[in-house]
């Protein structure tokens, strides 16, 4: 299996990443940044989000495993103290695959497409925005206000909740 590691950049995360790299090589895995099948994210949720955006064009080809060394770890699978357990699972157990929906936002005015695991926000503190909102190319509504926040199920507990939005069960297929 080919793998790569994205870490948060602090000394502790780098140390955990190096330990993980050595242990994975010891069980016969190949470290390969270019053709990875598994990406290990060592840090917190922000590190995982960065890793997802780094590999956004290959999401259907790779899987992510997150190791928590950061501040927030809602998406992390293992803690930094469980690296040996992780390597054991990689070698001996069938992994449980958990899929998360990504939110795609097309911005035709600037010819850009954005993807989000948590939420997409469009906001202005300086003036009122008037937004025409479409879902799957079908007009939904016009919105006038300081902005809009659209979240996925996993993002419903983040900024959306702080904005008094509903928390959505991850098993539901809704925004």
Which stretches of residues belong to each language-model region?
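ATP/NTP phosphate-donor binding region
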Residues: 1-42, 49-57, 79-98, 106-113
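Short coil/turn connectors at secondary-structure junctions
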Residues: 35-36, 59-62, 111-112, 144-146, ...
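Short glycine-rich anion-binding loops that position phosphate/pyrophosphate groups of nucleotides
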Residues: 44-47, 70-72, 154-157
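A glycine- and small-aliphatic-rich helix-loop capping segment at beta-alpha/alpha-beta transitions
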Residues: 55-62, 80-86, 163-173
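Short, acidic/small-residue loops that bind anionic groups at enzyme active sites
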Residues: 60-76
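Catalytic core of DAGKc-family lipid kinases
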Residues: 72-147
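Gly/Ser/Thr-rich active-site loops/lids in small-molecule metabolic enzymes
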Residues: 141-175
């Amino acid at each position: 299996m080919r793998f790569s590691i994205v870490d948060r950049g602090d000394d502790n995360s780098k140390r955990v990443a190096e330990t993980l790299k050595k242990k994975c090589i010891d069980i016969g895995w190949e470290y390969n940044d270019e053709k990875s099948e598994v990406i290990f994210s060592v840090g917190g949720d922000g590190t995982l989000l960065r890793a997802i955006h780094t590999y956004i064009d290959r999401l259907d080809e790779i899987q992510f495993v997150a190791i928590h060394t950061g501040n927030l770890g809602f998406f992390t699978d293992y803690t930094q103290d469980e690296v040996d357990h992780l390597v054991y699972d990689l070698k001996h157990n069938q992994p449980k695959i958990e899929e998360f929906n990504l939110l795609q936002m097309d911005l035709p005015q600037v010819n850009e497409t954005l993807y989000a695991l948590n939420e997409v926000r469009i906001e202005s503190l300086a003036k009122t925005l008037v937004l025409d909102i479409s879902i799957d190319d079908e007009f939904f509504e016009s919105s006038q206000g300081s902005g809009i926040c659209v979240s996925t199920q996993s993002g419903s507990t983040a900024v959306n909740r702080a904005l008094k939005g509903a928390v959505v069960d991850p098993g539901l297929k809704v925004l």
